[in-house]
Amino acid sequence: MIGTEANVLDRILAERAARLKVAGATFGSRLPSLRSAPLVPLASPAPSGVAPGAGEHAPFQPAAQAHGPALFEIKRRSPSRGVIAEGLNAVEQAERYHRGGARAFSVLTESEWFGGSLEDLIAVKERFPDCAVLRKDFLQLPEELEVSFRAGADAVLLIAAALAREDIAAMLEQAAALGLAALVELHDRADLEKVAPLKPTLVGINSRDLRSFKVDKLTPPALAAEISWNCRLVFESGIGGYEDAYFAGCSGFHGVLVGESAMRNPERVPEILAGLEDAYGVARARGRSRVSACRGNPRFWGELASRRAALQMGRARPLVKICGLTTAADARLAAECGADLLGFVFAESPRRAEAALLEEIADLRCLKVAVVQADDARCSHQGSAHRRSGARHGRHPDGSTDARAAASPDTDTDTRADTRADTGRAELQPEVARLLERGLLDAVQFHGGEQPADCLALAYPYYKAVRVRDARDLELACEYRSPRVLIDAFDPERAGGTGKRINPELVRQAAERGALWLAGGLTPENIGAIVAEYRPELVDVSSGLEGAAGRKDPDKLKRYMEEIADVCTV
C-alpha cells in the first residue's frame, strides 16, 4: 500500500509508458484479430434540457435521469488499499455481481498496480456478451482503443489528469469511430477546464483524488454544478451501499462506478441499485420507496460544495453557519454579513424557531437547516456503541453546540449494515416535513439519538451531530453516511447551548480524519485563533453571538465575520 503523500498517478503513468514502449499497446496479450462480441451501450443518450450545472435553481427531475450506468469493478489490488483479492477469478466475480442485478462491469487491465490484464476483460466479455464492459486503465495512446475494442470492451476510461487535451480529443474521435463509449474522468476544476471545449457526452467525476487517494464525496456534486454542456454523469468512488448510491442519484448523477466496497461485498449490488432507483423516483412511482417522503433541496450538498469552492478561489475562509436564529432581522443580518447557512432549532429550547419565520425569510439565498431531534425511544439502537452514544444525547438540541468537526471516511469500503429506512416508528416533526417539502428548508441536522439506520428514513438531505466525550465517539461519527458529520462536545445535562468547547486534542484528531466542521463555544474573541490553528471547513456559532438567548447581538455578529476575514486574507 502506497502512502497518500506520494503522487501515485505520475508513477503509474511513467511506469506504464515505459512498458508500453517495450511491449506495445497489447502489453503482450494475445487478442483476436476481429471482435466477435456485440457492442453493448454503456448508457442511453443524455436527457435533453438543462445541463448538469445550468444554474443553482435549475429544475431537478430525477425520474428522467434513470437507466444510467451502474458499473461494478473487478480488480485484485489497488495503490490505496493494497491487496484486495490476489487470486481473484475475474469471471467468478462478474458472476457474483450479475446475480445481484449488475449488467455493467468495470475491468481493471493495469497489471503492476492493480493486478489486472486484458485477458480478464476478454474472459468477462465472453461470459457476459450482453453486458456492458468498461476497460479501466490509464490509457495513453489512441491505438490502445482499437486493442480495447478487439478485446471486447464496450467502453473505455479516459482520465483527464493523465492526458493532454489534444490526446483526449484524438481518443474521443477514435472511440466514436469504433463505436466505443468514452467515460471521461474528472477530479478537479483543472480537469474540467481541460475537457470543457470537447464537451464529452459521458463524464465520470471521481471523489478519490488519484494523487493523494483521499475521498471527498462533495467533490463530484461540486464539479457537476460547473458543467455547462449536456452529458450523462457517473459518480466514481465513495459508494459503499444504499445511502451513498441514493446520495449520488439525488445529486444529479445518472450512474455510479463502485470499486473496493463491491469487490469485498458483492452482496451489496442489489442495495446499491435500489439506492439509485429510489433517488430517480422509479421505486417511489411503483410504491416501493425505502426512504422518507420528506425531501428538501436535493442540490443541498452540491450548492454547499460550490460555495466552498468559490471561497477557496478567493479569500480562503471557512463556510459560516449562524444557528439558533429566531427573528427575521437576525436572519437577514446574518445573510448580509456573509453567512452561508442559517440554522433554526425545532426542539424545546429558548432558541426554538417558528415555522412562520421561514415564510418571512423565503427570499434569502442562504441555505437553511432545521436542527431537530428524533425521540430516542423511537430510534433504532444497533450495537453497544450506538446505545452508549444515544444515552448521551440530551433532549434539547441547540444550534449553539459546543464543538463539531466533520469526520469523512477516506474509503468507499463500508462493512456496516444497509442503512435503508427500516427503523419503524421514528418520524420527523410534521412542521419540519412541511417546510422541507415546500422548499423553505433545505436540509436537516439530526441532533438526537438517531442511529445510522434512522437518518435517511426520516429526511433527506441531512447531516448528523454526534456528541463526543472521547476518541471512541470519533469512530462512531464515521459510521454515519452523510458527507459531513458534526461533532459536538459532551454535556451530561444538555445537548447544546452550554458554551463549552470540545477537547482540543479531539478537534485535532477529527481534523486529521477529514474536512473539519467546528462550532460551539465560538466567539468573536476566539474565532480568529481557532480558524488559524485548525483550518475548519465550516464554523457553526449560536450563543457566542447572542445578547440574550435567541437574539443575536449585531456588533458581535459583524465582528465575528470580520475576525474570520482578517485571519483568512490571502
Over which residues does each language-model region extend?
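Conserved, mostly hydrophobic/aromatic
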Residues: 12, 72, 97, 148, ...
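Glycine-rich phosphate-binding active-site loops on the catalytic face of alpha/beta enzymes
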Residues: 147, 151-167, 204-214, 253-272, ...
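Catalytic beta/alpha-barrel core
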Residues: 105-114, 132-141, 154-165, 180-189, ...
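An N-cap/entry alpha-helix motif that binds or orients negatively charged groups
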Residues: 2-85
